Design a protein with these regions (language model features):
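Terminal catalytic/cofactor-binding subdomain
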Residues: 1-118
Length: 118
């Protein structure tokens, strides 16, 4: 059995039935100012990651989206879970629109990258 098939078999052996299987994702991004410096994590006299987190959570209060501030200062979006990948794609598009509109207003940029803190 190929490595791909063994991995697939292992993953699916721990999964639930097709009728109840759902999919979700987590997306992390770092936020930078116009000088390519990361924005502060804590509240201060400039727009911070903490300010962004509060605004994102307010904007998503009527959904199952979850936002958090990660140890490296990046913002993480955890999607709701969906049965259809198209619904997940729609949720991702809404998340991107929400965060991008805030960043544009504040003159900030994002870098989407997953990191390992160790």
């Amino acid at each position: 059995m190929s490595v791909k098939n063994r991995l697939k078999s292992y993953i699916l052996s721990k999964s639930i039935g097709d009728k109840t299987r759902k999919i979700g994702i987590e997306v992390e991004c770092f936020i930078f100012d116009k000088n390519k410096k990361r924005i502060p994590v804590n509240k201060c006299d400039t727009f911070s990651a903490s300010d962004l987190l509060v605004e994102l959570n307010l904007n998503s209060k009527n959904s199952n989206d979850q936002y958090s501030l990660e140890p490296g200062g990046q913002i993480e979006w955890a999607s709701p879970v969906f049965e259809k990948i198209q619904d997940l794609d729609n949720a991702l598009s809404k998340h991107k629109h929400s965060i991008d509109s805030i960043l544009k207003r504040e003159g900030l940029q994002s870098l989407y990258i997953g990191v390992d803190p160790f």
